[in-house]
């Protein structure tokens, strides 16, 4: 945000640190790690809606998003839409978050895509599909071992978004008007 900075170490201790972006001073430490309905167990992604003074915590283990105010008070939660996991969670606009709906390594399929989800109830407002010829995943399997490198699929770019799909040879630009256009193309 312009005034607030949120930091976490992706779940190890459950701490979410709130800083004043201008001064760099710590404002508070929030920890809602636990097994209760208003707690997270593995806070993997956090995004801030500074206008509404809310933070959205994507709990990878329970596959839900919990919403807190900036003092750490629970406001609401909602589950992911299906068996997917959300990678890269960002504040998109007043009413939506943008994320990449991903599936476990051995279940990766053509249902994976970028989505806009409601900040109120988690419902999918829009699926954003990028074209590709053949489904390819960066997963290597050998005997019982599976290696899946971590990479990011969603990048903010001024007022637009850069969207990456490992099956595509193109990085796409998604604009606020809902249009998709090639940004970087492998030739």
Set out the residue ranges of the language-model regions.
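Beta-strand-rich domains and repeat architectures in extracellular enzymes and scaffolds
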Residues: 1-15
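Surface-exposed loop and turn segments in beta-propeller and other repeat-based domains
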Residues: 28-40, 79-83, 125-147, 181-187
């Amino acid at each position: 945000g312009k005034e607030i900075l949120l930091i976490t170490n992706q779940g190890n201790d459950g701490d979410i640190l709130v800083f004043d972006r201008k001064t760099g001073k710590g404002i508070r430490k929030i920890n809602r790690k636990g097994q209760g309905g208003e707690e997270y167990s593995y806070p993997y992604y956090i995004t801030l809606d500074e206008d509404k003074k809310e933070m959205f915590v994507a709990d990878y283990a329970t596959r839900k998003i919990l919403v807190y105010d900036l003092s750490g008070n629970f406001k609401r939660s909602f589950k992911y839409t299906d068996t997917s996991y959300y990678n890269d969670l960002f504040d998109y606009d007043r009413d939506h978050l943008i994320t990449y709906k991903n599936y476990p390594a051995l279940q990766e399929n053509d249902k994976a895509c970028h989505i806009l989800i409601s900040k109120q109830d988690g419902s999918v407002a829009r699926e954003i599909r990028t074209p590709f010829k053949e489904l390819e995943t960066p997963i290597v399997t050998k005997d019982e071992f599976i290696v899946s490198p971590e990479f990011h699929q969603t990048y903010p770019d001024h007022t637009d978004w850069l969207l990456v799909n490992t099956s595509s040879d193109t990085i796409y630009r998604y604009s606020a008007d809902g249009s998709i256009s090639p940004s970087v193309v492998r030739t």
